[in-house]
Amino acid sequence: MRFFIYLIPILSRIPLAFINLKNIMIIILICIFILGNYTMYQKKPLMLLFCSTFVSPFVMGKTIETTNKNILPEIVVYGDNNKSLSSVKTLSSDEISKTPTSNGNITDYLRSNPHIRYENSDQNGFQRGEIKPENISINGADPNQSAYFVDNVNINNDLAIDSSIFDGAMQVVPGISHTQAYFFDATMLSKVEVQDSNISASLGGFMGGAVIAKTKQYSGTDSIKLKYRTTNSSWAKMEAGDSVQKILKLVRPDDVGVAELQPKYNKQTFNILAEKRLNDNLGMVFGYSRRTSSIEQNRLIGFDKDANNKAQLDKQNHQRLSDNLLLNFNWTPQEKERIEFGLRYSNYKELKYFKXNINNNVSDYHQALGATLAWVHSFNSGVWTNTLAYDRFQDKRKSSSNSVEITSVLDEYYEPLYNFEKGGYGNSQLIQDNLHFSTEYVMDPFYLASTEHSISVGGIYQATKYQFYRPQDVHSKIILSTLKSDGSMEEPPTSTENTTSKGRVKTSYQNIAIYAEDLIKWNKFELRPGIRIERDDYLKNNNIAPRFVARYHPWDNTGFTLGLNRYYGRSFASLKLANGILKLNNDSTRQHQNFSSLKSPYADELSLSFDQNMGNFALKLGYIHRDNKNRIILKREPIQGERKTSYINGHPFGVDIYTFQLNNIEPWKLGKTYWTTSLGFDWLNTKRADVSNEFNPNEPVYLDGKLMTRSQMLQQVNSSTEDWIARLGIDMTIPDYNITWSNKVYMKAPIRSYEELDGDNGDGISRFRSYHYGRHTQWDSSIRWQPTIRGKHSVYMQVDILNVLNKTRKNKVTTISTSDEYGVYTPGREFWLEVGYQF
C-alpha cells in the first residue's frame, strides 16, 4: 500500500490528454516493474538504511525555463555536473558514424584513446570471423576492473570473472561470458565517454576507469535510419605461413569448440533506429540491430579404417549471432520535470561443435535484459535525479545430450591413434539479477564569501542475486581401446565412469555507496574535493575513497592540474557462487574457501597534467601514477600433497602512464575542404605480473630453458607487452559534396613478452619462452558519401579499409606437433561496405 502512496504525486501530474489505451498500458507496465522489484527487495536492511538516508532533504521547488517545449533534453548523467576537472574523452554519434571500425561494438571505437589498451593488444588475423567486443584495460589495470555504465546504470557482468577457476570443467558450465553484459551496436548510442583519471566521486566499481554510454533519446524530430554493413574473408588479406597452409583447408575447432583458424567467413549487420513523437510531451526511440557471422569449419564424422584410420570430415559452419533491442520513452509532464523509461535487450549466441565430437551440437548464449526508470525534477536550489533499474544477465549452454562417451584408441604398442566422443555435456546456466537505485542532488552554483560552490550529493544501492542451474546429471564414460595388428579390438576395453550432479546454487550480494563533492572556484583556481563511502555484505569492508583535483589557470589559455584519488574496484561477489558450483561438482582440485578474509581491491592515483591552447592548437601533457593493491587473483598451491587453486589478494603493482595529446581546435579550411587532426602518444610502464594468473613469485619456472623463479622471469621481460603507442587522426570533409574521409594511424612499440609452453614434463615446473616482435604500423581509413535526395531523405555509402598498407606482424607462435609450429599474425587489409537510408 505504501508503494501506491509514493506514486500518487507522480500520477496526479499526468494530463488528461495523455490518458488513452496505449499510454495506460505503458503506465501499467511501469507500475508492475516498480512494484515487482520493490516487493522483491523491500526487506533488505541496506535498502531500508539507504531510503531513510535520502528521503528527506528535497523539499524546494523551481521551474526550469525552456525555449522549446518540443525539444526534450536528456536527463542528467552522473559525473556530468562537475566533470570539467575530470579527464574525459567523449565520442559523439557523429564521430562514431565516421570512424573506421570492424564490428561496431562500443570498445571498437576506443582505439584512439591514449589511456586504453586492449586485453589482446594485437588482434588475431586467423579469427576475423568473430563479432564479440574486445576487453579493454584502462591505465594498466586488469580488464575486469573497467566499469561499464549505460544510462546511469552499471552493466558489468560479474559472471565473466570466474571462468578461470573452472579450467578442466568447462563443458559442464556455460562456455562463454563477457565483462560487458550488453553488446550494443554503437549506432544506438548518442555518445560514449571514457573517464580515465580524476574521476568524479559519483562513479565507482573500478580500478582502471569508466566507460559511460548514453543510449539514443528522442531528439524532437521524427526520423528513421536504416543501415546494412558487410564483409567476408574474400575481402581480406590473411598472413599465413607454409606450416599453417596445409591445415587451413581442413580446419577444425579445438576441444572446447573455439574456432582457432577461420580462413573463410561471412559477416553481416542490419540496423534500424526510429524516433517518433507520440504527443507534445512524449517521444519514443526504437532501435534494433542484428549482427551475424558464418565461419567455415570441418566436423568429424568418423574414421576410415581402410585409409589408416584417417579422420573423415564434413564442412559445417560455426555461427555467431548478436541481437540488440532498445526502446526509450521520454516524457516531460511539465517543464520542471522529465521522466525516462527504457527497455534494453541483448542476445549473443554461438552455434558450434567440438573437435572430436561426432554427433552433438552446442549453443552458447550471453544474454541481458533490463529496464530503467529515471525521474528528474528541478527545485529552487538545484536538480534532483533518481534512477531505478533492473537487469538480468544470463550465460547459458544448451546441448542435445547430457551423456557423453569418450573413446581413445591405442595401437598395439599403446601409442595413441585417434580419439572421438559421442553425446554431450548437458544444459547449464548462470544468472545475475541486479536491482539498482540511485539518487543525486546537484545544487545550483552559489557564492560563499569570494568563492563559488557547486555541490553534488548522492547515493547508490544495488542488490544482486546470482544463481547456477544444471537441470540434469551429466554422465561421462571414458573408454580406452587397443587396436591389434590384425585390425580387431582388444577385449574387454578399459572404461571409467563419472557423474556431475544436477542442482541449483544461489547466493546474493548488496552494496551501498554515498558520495559528495564540491566544485569550488576562486580567482584562477578550481578545486573539487569529494568523498565516496561504500559498504557491501560480501567482503564486509567499509571503503572510504577520497577524491581531490585542483586546477590553476595562470592565463586564459593555460592550465595546470593535480589530482589525488582512490578508486575501489569490483570485489567479485560472484566468486561465492563459483565456490558453491565447485562443491556441487565435487571438485577436489579447488580449495573451497570463506572469502571474508579478502580485502577490497583499490588503486591510489596521483595525476599531473598541463594543457595549453596555442592559436588553433590544443596541447595536453599528462602523467598518472597508480598503485594497484589487493587485487583478487587465482592462486595455485600444494595442499596436503594436491595442487589446489584458491582466491587471494595479490601483490601490489605500480603503473606509470605518460601521455601527449595535440589537436586543432577549429577545422582548417583548404579550398572546399575542412580538416581536423589529432596526435596522441602514450608510454605505459607497469610491473604487473600477467602470466596466466599470479602464483607464488618464488615458484620455480623455466624461461628459455633456464631455471629461475617467477619473479626473476618477470624482471627479464616486459610485463605490459608494449611500452608505447602513437596515434594519428586526420579527418577531411567536403560539405558541398557530402563527403567525409576519416583516417586513423596507429604505431605500436615492439612486443617483448613470453608465453607458456604446453606439455607435462613430470616435474610440475611450468616452462615459458620469451619472444620479441618488431614495431607495427596500421592505417585505417573510411570514406563516406551521403547525398540528400529530397527534403529529409538521404542515402549514404561508406567504405572502411582497415590496415590500408597491409602491414602485419607476428604476435605469437602456435605448436602443431613436436617438430612443427606456425606463426599467428595480425590481420591484413580488410574491406567493409556499409549502405544506409535516412528520412
From Swiss-Prot:
One of its GO terms (molecular function) is siderophore uptake transmembrane transporter activity. It is found in: Cell outer membrane. Transmembrane segments: none annotated. The keyword Hydrolase does not apply. It is a multi-pass membrane protein. One of its GO terms (cellular component) is cell outer membrane. Residues 221-839 form the TBDR beta-barrel domain. InterPro entries: Plug_dom, Plug_dom_sf, TonB-dep_rcpt-like, TonB_rcpt_b-brl_sf. Residues 80-216 form the TBDR plug domain. GO terms for biological process: siderophore transmembrane transport. Its main location: membrane. Keywords: Cell outer membrane, Membrane, Transmembrane, Transmembrane beta strand, Transport. Belongs to the TonB-dependent receptor family. This is Uncharacterized protein HI_1369. It comes from Haemophilus influenzae (strain ATCC 51907 / DSM 11121 / KW20 / Rd).
